[in-house]
Amino acid sequence: ANLATESELVKLDISPDLVSLILSNRPFLSIHDFNKVLANYDKEELFKKIFVPLNLNTTNEKDFKMIPGVGDRMAHEFEEYRPYKSIQQFKREIGKYVDEIEVSRYLSYIFVPVELNTSSEENIKALPGVGNKMAHEFVEYRPYMNLNQFRREIGKYVDDKELIRLERFVYLK
């Protein structure tokens, strides 16, 4: 919300009033400041359009509560099962507390980072916005010696903005 241009916000199909509100209240020093500005809006729909997925292994409990419908108890449970090795583990553990529909809804807001050289193609496909073709490309260029190699190889298929987004989801041992 701090970096998006007016035209980028409009492309998200949000109301002109909300676009103006966001622009006039920037910069947001934290997600909590942004959340306060959105108090009178349908945050669930908006967050699906603009939310940056949270890393299940590093996000603090307070930030998990920014996910629509996540309260104290569920935020605690998100932290309780760390470290997560896969989205499947998250589904299994959190599925003890909520139904499958709710677990699936949470997947719009979170991710488990993947190790580039060892993660299964299934775990790579669980990353936000990564489909079969991109997951295949991640695997095809193994072994990765460093993140520069990842940037060079995957950068053949996506623009710089998407490459930066994808890099948030991966690491090397």
Where do the PLM segments sit?
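Residue-level signature of tetratricopeptide-repeat
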Residues: N25-P27, Y81-P83, Y141-P143
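Short alpha-helical segments in extracytoplasmic peptidoglycan/chitin-binding modules
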Residues: L9, V19-L23, D33-N35, F64-I67, ...
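Small-residue hinge/turn detector
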Residues: S15-P16, G71, G131
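Long, low-complexity acidic/proline-rich regions
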Residues: K125-P128, N132-R152, Y157-K173
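Disulfide-bonded cysteine-rich modules in secreted/extracellular proteins
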Residues: A1-A4, L54-F64, V114-I124
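Short functional linear motifs
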Residues: E6, V19, K43, E61, ...
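Alpha-helical interaction/regulatory segments in DNA maintenance proteins
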Residues: K36-N57, Q88, R92-N117, I154-K173
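Short loop/beta submotifs within extracellular cysteine-rich repeat domains
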Residues: L18, L29-H32, Y41-D42, M74, ...
